[in-house]
Curated annotation (Swiss-Prot):
NCBIfam families: PRK01305.1-1 (NF002341), PRK01305.1-3 (NF002342), PRK01305.2-3 (NF002346). GO terms for molecular function: arginyl-tRNA--protein transferase activity; leucyl-tRNA--protein transferase activity. It holds the Pfam family ATE_N. GO terms for biological process: ubiquitin-dependent protein catabolic process via the N-end rule pathway. Functions in the N-end rule pathway of protein degradation where it conjugates Leu from its aminoacyl-tRNA to the N-termini of proteins containing an N-terminal aspartate or glutamate. Belongs to the R-transferase family. Bpt subfamily. It is found in: Cytoplasm. InterPro entries: Acyl_CoA_acyltransferase, Asp_Glu_LeuTrfase, N-end_Aminoacyl_Trfase, N-end_Aminoacyl_Trfase_C, N-end_Aminoacyl_Trfase_N. This is Aspartate/glutamate leucyltransferase.
Amino acid sequence: MTHPTELPLSPLSALQFYATAPYPCSYLDGRIARSQVATPSHLINSDIYTELVKAGFRRSGVFTYRPYCDGCRACVPVRVPVDAFAPNRAQRRAWKRHRALVATVSPLHYDEEHYALYMRYQSARHAGGGMDRDSRDQYEQFLLQSRINSRLVEFRDLDTPKDGASALRMVSMIDILGDGLSSVYTFFDPDESHASYGTYNILWQIEQAKSLRLPYVYLGYWIRESPKMAYKANFHPLEGLVDGRWKVLDPTLVDLPPVDAALARAPLPGGHSGTR
């Protein structure tokens, strides 16, 4: 564990970092994962969380973590530099196809219609993974608990009414950081088989970041071996945090070193090296 007295004087100096016990990897079959967790959660405000995200951390509810797996560096934190981003042909088509969607931004809040869409999405896209059985309480802990500057965005299709109201197509949770937007989680209508809601959502976030004059959209972790993560490599240029530095990735050539050597070279925010 990293103790507060071991960190330089900074807003991060009150945080502690510890490694979890091993657990089955959610993304790569047969792999064992560990996480490095930043605590206590009540001290992690938006400014501190921005620095943690720059160092490869993410959050799930109020739980802030980064991968800390023995001998594996498959999870690469990635972000899109919005001013340099150039959509490809498929992305331009997705943007045009879903131009009828109307986005409404609001504080995090529970809505029964959102939860119903979440459960439909999990049952269709992640059946058997556990999240398809999430209770309302689990849903709220995962997506609606935050101590930082977070927003909920719902996307409705005004051209396709449902039961007399505009159809809910997608919901996205987004964190607003000091240097960008961080995509927390997005779920959408799984019955629209020809839709490109996920792609459209990232394009929408890129446009929002530009309008807010924020340089990046953080997309979480990209895993080359995971088909579920493949879509992130379609956004160019894509920057990844490798050996403690953000650099433009060539997704076909990324070859990462073992985690122990890499984390030894990758300092925690404030200049302190990662420890166990």
